[in-house]
Amino acid sequence: MIRPTKRDPLGILDENLTRRTWNAYNAYINLYAEVKLPLGFKYRLNATPDLSFERNTSYENIYDFGLRNNAVSNMTEYRYQKNNFLIENLLTFDQTFGKHKISALLGYSYQNYHTRYILASGKGLPEGITEVGAATQDRMNDTWSKESALTSIISRVFYSYDNRYLITATYRRDGSSKFAKENRYGHFPSVSVGWNIAEEHFMEQSKSWMDQLKLRAGYGILGNQEIDDYMYTSVITSNINYPDGNGGLISGAFPKDFANPAIKWEETEMTNIGVDMAFMNSRLMITGDWYRKNTKD
């Protein structure tokens, strides 16, 4: 029988000399409950947790294969966790009265996003021990976490008369933890109108070859919060090592970025005018649009 040793080339096959592991777990769940109410109302609750966890380890024992060797055992382990929760409460209304059609939505949503990272490493582990906490030399650990939340009030009203004249109005009020309290909330309205000319009585003779002729126009304000977390305040970074002048290291901390408490929602004003046309049982379709977009802040 040949036994691998730390100086034998066969030793590289020994899992006690080098070991790397990677484990990842993900779970995405979409839960909902819906209740129909009188008079055309309906209530719906959506709950969507999105969870992930990752753990990686890397271990090297002492070995010597000539040109390739490792004099001190070492190990590194890191863990990463991400949780994203979204809860929505939606109340809708949908009714038709003769030629009048009305639908409406009122909702509230809350989203929480949290991530956490942990890293630990060290050298000089006792023989047969693969726990980074047992390291006797150059022990180091680092950890950070960040969290953000978004709350939204959503409303929308749609009205149509005889499928000829259409209007939709929406309003959102969003609050983001990425901004300071005085700039936390943004207000984003929009309105759009449409005219189905092909449904007018004076277009009756054209229906044999024209299926659709619709004019539409819209104006709205969109909000954008896609920035890094905590930009409105000063973030301290720790676990920074400095030489002590005697061959050792001193742990310290320093401000990572300059605070900007004036940062706020980016707003984009959009204006759109368009036309939709369809001919010969929709064999030929034409769509034209004119846009104007203005972004500020």
Task: List each model region and its residues.
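Extracellular/periplasmic, surface-exposed regions of secreted and cell-surface proteins
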Residues: 2-60, 70-297
